[in-house]
Amino acid sequence: MFDTLPMRDPEARTVDDVPSTPEEETALASFRAALKEENVVVPRTMCANGGETGALLRYLRARKLDVTKATSMLRATIAWREENDIDALLSSPLDEDEFRANAAMYPASYHGEDAAGRPVYMERTGSAQFAALVTKLGQEGFLKMHLRGMEYQYRVLLPSASVKRNKPITQMCNVIDVGELSLYDTVSHGEVLRALKAIAAVDADHYPENLGITLVCNAPWSFTSAWSVVRLFLDTKTQAKFKVLGKGKEQLKALEEALGGIDKVPAFLGGECVCPGGCVCLDPKHEPTERVLTDAQVRYARFCFANRESRVPEDDVPGDVAEGLGALDLNGDAGDVAAEKDEAPEP
């Protein structure tokens, strides 16, 4: 099993979200009226996930249906996106060597879908070399790397998942393996802590309601100390979405239920999934992997390399994308990924 969500253009179709309660419906009507009166237009890229209705509902839900607060939040996000040219992130230059070097210090990848159809982001947090990566990229570069990933989720993975399920899929499922977490490399390191604060603030202010759940695996004693600091950056609603799993069989059972089967759980978490190229490659604290990047990482990199002025067909397979991009050999393995047919596994 490997991530097979098709690549989509930010303008590609999605499934519009809808109000879930009469209160939301009433607030949505008032929100639209307020935006019209103030001549606020929601950018098309912000509507990629759930349509314009979905975009508006996320801001309403984040502000507990307070139209005035939701309007202020939305206006701030639109201004922030314009000032920082966020729409161009997926088309801005992506250096191949830098991408591979960063992946070596930050083992993470997308990993199919969970049982609810949400795209899964998987990260071996305990093995990440945060201090080295922040030093290498700087605060701005580290944040930009995160934002590029958020835009990919928001404008590509979530719309694709929605179309696949024919219903709104507007949130992500994160699985983080915090085994061997180093306090020095995270909350005890001033620059890393500063970077984590910046990411938490941006996510809260400009990507509301993007997170469905974060499953925390293999939590060591150091995680308690780290979490006591990190949670201070998060609002109570986001904190509640972090679920620390038990150990051993208890953890495996929880992952199996959440991800939709033991064959969807990576071997390093006790499961039976064997992704072509690995579920998460390049773990610097463990054995080296045969390949540099997972299939999902290669797909992500190729998407960012693509000429975004031309639309990317919904049903492109990795081979088609590789051909269109000059067969980028991101793994240095003669394009093994390009030979794989892009067939989505059943959830």
Regions found by a protein language model. Name each.
Residues M1-P347:
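Basic, amphipathic alpha-helical/coil surface patches used to engage anionic, phosphate-bearing ligands
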